[in-house]
């Protein structure tokens, strides 16, 4: 998460923690025994916070191979204590895209016209002023960050072939696929 506004990150972080914990609990229930359950709980995704571009880039480089996705504001300082840059989020996402064209990115802003910047770097956009921002965020996390059901699609038509909720579903359907 890249955000310099304490009021916003104070509200978004609990939402993210709750979502990740809920997903971890669901994942842990598939464990064969208590030890595996605890191991799966400890292996849940970590959420890191950056307040400027430099910090965000350092964190991204540190965790790039294990990054599920990046959520960023559009406007924040490039350096600690520096002036806010109107397009810092776009600059960050452009740099990330050069390194990894597939990592999910979410650009959020209270300015709806910034949605165009999100499109330019193939990112999703969430309006901070939306009354259902929490729901939009959860939906994007579930659909693009690797949470939720595993959906198998026909590569030609993109039609859903199968939806697997857990390993049991995979076992039950493996020969049908």
Located regions from the model:
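A short, hydrophobic beta-strand element within the central beta-sheet of small alpha/beta folds
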Residues: 68-72, 90-127
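Acidic, metal-coordinating helix/loop segments flanking the phosphotransfer/catalytic sites
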Residues: 27-69, 77
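Short, flexible/disordered intra-domain loops and linkers
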Residues: 11-14, 78-88
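Short acidic-hydrophobic, aromatic-tinged amphipathic segments that line or gate anion-handling sites
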Residues: 48-51, 125-129
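CheY-like receiver
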Residues: 1-14, 59-62, 136, 138-140, 145-177
């Amino acid at each position: 998460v890249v955000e310099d506004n304490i009021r916003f990150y104070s509200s978004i972080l609990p939402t993210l923690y709750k979502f990740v914990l809920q997903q971890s609990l669901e994942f842990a229930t598939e464990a064969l025994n208590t030890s595996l359950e605890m191991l799966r709980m400890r292996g849940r995704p970590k959420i890191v916070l950056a307040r400027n571009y430099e910090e965000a880039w350092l964190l991204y480089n540190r965790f790039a191979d294990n990054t599920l996705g990046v959520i960023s504001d559009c406007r924040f300082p490039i350096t600690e204590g520096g002036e806010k840059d109107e397009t810092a989020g776009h600059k960050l996402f452009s740099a990330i895209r050069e390194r990894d064209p597939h990592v999910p990115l979410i650009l959020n802003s209270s300015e709806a016209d910034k949605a165009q910047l999100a499109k330019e770097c193939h990112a999703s956009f969430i309006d901070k002023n939306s009354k259902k921002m929490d729901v939009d965020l959860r939906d994007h996390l579930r659909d693009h960050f690797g949470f939720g059901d595993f959906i198998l699609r026909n590569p030609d038509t993109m039609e859903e072939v199968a939806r697997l909720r857990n390993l049991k579903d995979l076992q039950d359907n493996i020969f049908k696929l």
